[in-house]
Amino acid sequence: MTTNVQEMFGSLLLDKKIVASLTAMGFEEPSPIQEQTIPLVLEGSDVIGQAQTGTGKTAAFGIPVVQSITDHRHIQALIMTPTRELAIQVAEEIGKIGRTSKIKALPVYGGQPIDRQIRALRSGVQIVIGTPGRLIDHINRKTIKLDHIKFLVLDEADEMLDMGFVDDMEEIMKNLPAERQTLLFSATMPRPILSLTKKYMKAPKNVTISKEELTVPLIDQYYFETKDKIEGLCRLLDAEIDGKLIIFCRTKKGVDDLAIALGSRGYMAEGLHGDLSQTQRDRVMKKFRDGTADILIATDVAARGIDIDNITHVINFDIPQDPESYVHRIG
């Protein structure tokens, strides 16, 4: 398998330690965004990537960042994400990529005691992944120092814009060293994001993954019409589904209402949305991971970054408003 990975990633000029990590993670060949992005980052370019969740974009920036930094104790890469869940998942994946290179990644986000994060930062990490607000908090406390930053990554930049983080994003960007690489990934390119790219990026190279490449051919997709959605859902759960599943609703109230409705019918269902505290969110995810609950009902933003093995079904109880959100959900 190592030989196969080396052959498939060979043209990307990856070192043996990275290849060993990718082999352990089960990689076989680079995805389109990885194949296009990794060489650009390794050659020193800024990159704008238009890609969704499910395309392998975390590894597309994680692999070259890990290869390009050292195991010195200071922070050399900063990655901004819109949600806590995505920060955690990105940190976990980059931690796996960097394991054989002794590169450590730490997620920082609101809702977790900041003292615990400060202790972890002082122990020495090379990559910090976090939500903009908590990153600014650490920067103001000087527990995150920007002097040695070589890479800034903006992951799901349009989502951060939608959540009102654009001022925080710019506050961080304008205080970073001028000599750095900036990598920005976004499903869409609204005007404020384009403005950031023009102001803070140097001759960026563009990587765009077409909508055809975004779809996942191994996923069977079905559409059901029913007069009573809850009754129709329950019949589907009873007749067809045996395993873990995620159900998407458009609103927080929709999540709560459906969780109550399914719970009253005896289903082991838990709801996840942005009004939950971090402790509540962690408890919900623990139940879903360990099988105490086998149905997770979530909003789009709350579900970003969720990485659970053995999910057999995704149900769109409410149809998303755009095709990109649909791909985010099922991918």
Give residue spans per PLM region.
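Conserved helicase RecA-like core
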Residues: 2-330
